[in-house]
Amino acid sequence: MVAMSIEERLQRLEDRAAIDDLNVRYFLAADGDDMTAVAECFTSDASFSSSGHVGGQGRQGIADFIADARKNMGLTIHTPHYGLYEFGDAGQASGIVGAHLELVLAGQATYGAIRYVDCYRFEGGDWRIAARDMRTIYIGEWAKCAEVFASATPVQWPGIAPLPSDYPRRS
C-alpha cells in the first residue's frame, strides 16, 4: 500500500463522505419522485442496470427508466446501511452500497435487501454515479417476508416468477 500524505488522507475521507451523501441524495430523490435530482446523481454517460440488465443510459435515460418503474409504485423507502468504497485513479471509485427496500408495488407491500454495485466518477465538481447495478438479495410480499427470505428463490418481485438471489449462499 502506498503511503498517503495527511492532505491525501483528508481528501480520501472527504471523498468517502461525498459519495455517502450522493447515495443518500439518490435514495431521497427516488423516494420523493424528484427525477431532476435523480438525474443529477449520475454522470452524463452513466448506466443503470438491475441484475446486469441495462434499464437506462445517460442522465435522462436513467431518470425516465426510474420514473417509468415508479408508475406502478406507491410509497417507497430506500434505507442505506453501508457503503464500501475503493478508490482508483484520480476522480474514480467503485463501491458496494447495501440497503433495504420497503415498497408498495402494484398495490402490494414488499420488503427486501439489495446491493448496488457502483462505479463513481468526479464530474462537474461533484462525485456522481457512472454505473449502478442493483442486485437483489431477496424481496417479496411483506406478510411473507420470513418465508421468502428462507426460500431457494428469494427474489419474488410481484408479477414476476420467483428467481434465485443474486447472492446465493455458498455451500
Would you name each region that the model predicts?
Residues 30, 42, 99-101, 133-136:
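Short beta-strand segments enriched in hydrophobic/aromatic residues
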Residues 78-80, 110-117:
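Short, surface-exposed coil-to-beta transition loops
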Residues 140-171:
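Acidic/histidine-enriched, glycine/proline-rich intrinsically disordered or flexible terminal extensions
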Residues 1-32, 36, 40:
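Short, low-complexity N-terminal intrinsically disordered segments enriched in polar/charged residues
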Residues 108-109, 121:
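Short aromatic-glycine motifs in intrinsically disordered, low-complexity regions
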Residues 35-105:
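A solvent-exposed, acidic/Ser-Thr-rich amphipathic alpha-helical stretch
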Residues 6, 48, 71, 98-108, ...:
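Extracellular/periplasmic carbohydrate-active domains that bind, remodel
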Residues 92-94, 115-147:
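Short beta-strand edge/turn micro-motifs at domain boundaries
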